Amino acid sequence: MSTDEERIYSIALTQIPGVGHIGAKRLVDGMGSATDVFRYRTELPDRLPGVNRAVVAALDSPQALKRAEQEYEFARNNRISCFTLADEDYPSRLRECDDAPVVLFFKGKANLNALHIINMVGTRNATDYGKHICVSFLQELQMQCPDVLVVSGLAYGIDINAHRSALSVELPTVGVLAHGLDRIYPSLHRKTAIDMLRQGGLLTEFLSGTNPDKHNFISRNRIVAGISDATIVVESAAKGGSLITADIAGSYHRDCFAFPGRINDEYSKGCNRLIRDNKASLLLSAEDLVHAMGWNIPATFSGKVNVQRSLFPDLSEEEQKIVSILEK
């Protein structure tokens, strides 16, 4: 569990120029905490090969610490959780990634370490076909795997339809933002975002006041991929942000799936190519996903045990003990 000091130093580390996502995580992992990265910064070149003097000099930054203190105060005043790599509530799947954020801001009720987590992404120009997939797929998934958490990016198109479809079947859903938690972008999705706070939440690595600039969306996509067991591309043109998310998921060695479409449909070309190039598995139903991920194994095993017991309804107490031992 992090202290307030560790949270402030973790935020400050994100404000140091020239460090980057991979560098920041490497520093924290190598020193054991963001606090020690700053406290023992002059020792970094000796303790962590590859760290240069420019980074050491940049870490001597009262401005970064002041900005971090302001942001932490903003988070506390607005009941925003601040998770560092040391926190149990930090997404464990994301922590495994080399470029995981050293700090995350979260508002909501979802468990970011839920047993099963998927993300659903796709084009901002969702067709009726894509919208129907979001609804029907999550309806079916809710019946087969009711504990799944649905992640997306709150953007136009497939993203917002995935969130709304999850809400409609009472699945928790988390939106990963490309800006701070002082705003909702696009503003048209504010009502859905508010609903998500009661049944999911909003997550970001960005400080308040950060604009939703183009490069932030790529950073956002790595969180979407890294927090999930599986990435599902619903619809995509030949080029698009969801294909970047799929590539990132592949680099993390996470499962990726795509729904196929007609070969001449503009917003199925990306999905069809992912499947053709073996970058994604073909997905036709929620049952396909549950089977591919092995999420149905415990239930199947349990069913076999129940069948075995029903074959021997009149066992003695001693015989029942033997059966119980064999089941273990």
Language model regions located:
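Short, small/acidic-rich helices and loops at N termini and domain boundaries
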Residues: 1-89
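Glycine-biased, small-residue-rich flexible motifs in mid-sequence functional cores and linkers
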Residues: 2-4, 84-328
